[in-house]
Amino acid sequence: MKLLRYGPPGQEKPGILDADGRIRDLSAHVPDLAGDVLSDAGLARLRALDPATLPLVSGEPRIGACVGRVGKFIGIGLNYADHAAEAGMPVPKEPVVFGKWTSSICGPNDGIDIPKGSVKTDWEVELGVVIGAPCKDVDEARALDYVAGYCVVNDVSEREWQIERGGQWDKGKGFDTFGPIGPWLVTRDEVPDPQSLDLWLEVDGHRYQNGNTRTMVFTVAQLIAYLSSCMTLQPGDVITTGTPPGVGMGIKPAPVYLKAGQMVRLGIEGLGEQLQLTRAAR
């Protein structure tokens, strides 16, 4: 299934894509795509519905983040060896974990606000993993059983705040609008191997990132097992799993960063695309 949330910010309704790619309303069956709705049992109930019998959503509504009430938004850094090299950092021996504030979350096609005074706002296309059941101390072999589904994430980052101003990644990753998620939550049954997905990103039509999740340093299963060893993962938690090479700060001979008025387009095979206009923060 391809699940989504649509409507104005803060008033999103749950929906599902039908066989023709049209949005069908799920709000008579679930209040939101959050919590227990993301469990195996909750998703099975949605899967049993015939989308053709659900109300058709007219027009072209705004698409919100594909998960509601996110509890934890967990980032993984330097999880592609070639990205670590372009950043001038060693390949980590353990996952690099940081937090993105949930207030950074926005819809996949909402604008990206360039922070006041920023000259180093950067892009990162990433595979997002949405947890569907509580998990603590799970082993790698069973880790994917706790996944509700997968989505596209743009881990927007302000490099000066992240690296130069005290080296605190949470600061540089957590500005408002720095966490576009979606358009869809694609349930795990439709993603048989999360380690074989092409992902890409363009700015103003120029392709900067072109990678595949097979080159991750730590797989999705390894990340879930690792994270669950130090925290309880809950339904609706989102893990964004790192980015392939081609970020702005790694461009040679000189870095390239986002400015107001640019179009960022990104996507992952089978998970949909995002399109964002950058704008100056007010």
From Swiss-Prot:
S-S pairs: none
Binding site for Mg(2+): E124, E126, D155
Keyword Hydrolase applies: yes
EC number assigned by the record: 3.-.-.-
Cofactor: Mg(2+)
InterPro entries per UniProt: FAH, Fumarylacetoacetase-like_C, Fumarylacetoacetase_C_sf
Origin superkingdom: Bacteria
Enzyme class, first EC level, given as a word: hydrolase
GO molecular function, one term: metal ion binding
Entries under Pfam families matching the protein: FAA_hydrolase
Signal peptide feature range: none
GO terms (BP aspect): urate catabolic process
Keyword field: Hydrolase, Magnesium, Metal-binding
PANTHER family from the UniProt entry: FUMARYLACETOACETATE HYDROLASE DOMAIN-CONTAINING PROTEIN 2A, FUMARYLACETOACETATE HYDROLASE DOMAIN-CONTAINING PROTEIN 2A-RELATED
Family affiliation: Belongs to the FAH family.
Name of this protein: Putative hydrolase Bmul_3283/BMULJ_05242
